[in-house]
Structure formats: structure tokens, C-alpha cells
Amino acid sequence: MRVVLDTNALIRAHGRTSTQARILLEELLRADHELITSNELLAEVTKVLRYPRFQALYGLSEADLLDYTQLLQSVSQVVILDSSYRAPLRDPNDLIVLQTAERGEADILCTNDGNFYDPTILSYCTARGIEVCDESTLLERLMQGG
């Protein structure tokens, strides 16, 4: 199964946590599924983890951030995005996530972001063979051997 975890999931999945997102990432990799990322997605994750509130919460050093980014790059298929990409999303920041899924021919785009559950976006994704599901649903599926 080819999976894109959205920015928020990847932020919560770094090595200093035991969150559902971290368990999901570990299970994806353990079960030999393919994680799909893009340089833009990884840059956004790194940028957000540098925000003061996340630094206060997680206390990640620059070395920790570099290690995490390198880990994600090494275990994922990194796809190249097109800056002219357009899709019917309300939040332009979500374009990176959606384009990563589309370019990477993902089977699943895993997100808890309500914008992706808009009927227009669900139809857009379905037409491209991409299922949108939340972290809990995907983790449950993986735990059942899916």
C-alpha cells in the first residue's frame, strides 16, 4: 500500500513521541508499505517543528530535526512536485499534501484535516484512485493486517 501521511501526522510522528501518529509511521514501515513524501512536505514538517510552541513541547535540536528529516527521506519515496499544480482545495497549504499523494500515485492519503473530507475533494481523490482516511482508521487497518 502506498501512503501519504499529511504534515500534521508527520509532525506528531517524530522520534520523541509515542503518539498515534508515531505508532502509525512505525507500523507502515514495519509492514513494508510505501511511505510517499516530497521535499516540500518534509520542509514544511521541519519548519513547523522549529516553531517556538513545538520547540517548547518537544525540545528538538537541529540535529534531531535533521535526523528525523533524513530518516523520512531514507524510508520514503520522495516525489517531485510541480509549482503550477492546482486542485479544488480551500486551503492552498493543503496543495502540497494532495499533490504529493497524486504525484506519488498513493493508495491512501492519511489525514485528520477536515478540508480533505469535503465532498468535492473526496470525489477529486476518488477519481484519482486515492482513498482519504484518518489516522485511527488506517492504524486499525494496518493492525488487522491490511
Regions found by a protein language model. Name each.
Residues G104-I108, G114-G146:
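Acidic, PIN/NYN-like endoribonuclease modules and their adjacent C-terminal/linker elements
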Residues E27-S84:
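PIN-domain endoribonuclease scaffold, especially VapC-family toxins
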Residues A9-L10, L41, I96, N115-F116, ...:
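Alpha-helix capping/helix-boundary segments
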Residues M1-T37:
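Short, well-structured N-terminal submotif of metal-dependent ribonuclease cores
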